Amino acid sequence: LLKQFYLANTSSKKVYLNPVINGTDIQFEIKEGMCPIKSGWNNRGNMTCPCCGSITTVNQVKLQFKAKTSKEVLLAIISETNRGKLYRSPTKNEYIKPQSKNIDKPTDRMAVENNRNFNTPGWGIEIYGDMFSDRQLFMLQSFTKNFSLLKNKIEPTQYTQALYTYLAIWIDRIAVVNTSLGRWHNSGEKIE
């Protein structure tokens, strides 16, 4: 569902995903400089197949998401360094998804009656847990588990209570932007 290929698109830094297409197999490599591909494969939800050029309408794409036939693909690893963001291709080990038995997927249903401001039901997302990939849920649950362990090991004081509150707000902010619906803001090099 790529609308464009830039990971970083600032005046001083240009990094992009370069698709390498071999038949119906699509891999990505990370390159620096101007991206030669002017637009992505997603135009207002309508998808253009990069292999054959045929178009899948937004309604057909939504039906695929509702039928749970779509899948996620890890495209890049982004690391923070003292000189800014570093972009690289995932290693084979990083492609491995967390075991679903280690993930407690939320099963609460969303209020789908009035979805004017939150249009996930049209894409087959009616349960809160469906908003997250297994990798995102594993990360969030690891944070909260370790946060709870930390809370049990340190004697409560006003300072630690303030620290716990800060960490809880931080985890909440991470959860808001780290969903499958999140977008990468390439000119700010951050998640939106």
Located regions from the model:
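Nucleic-acid modification enzymes, centered on SAM-dependent nucleic-acid methyltransferases
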Residues: L1-E192
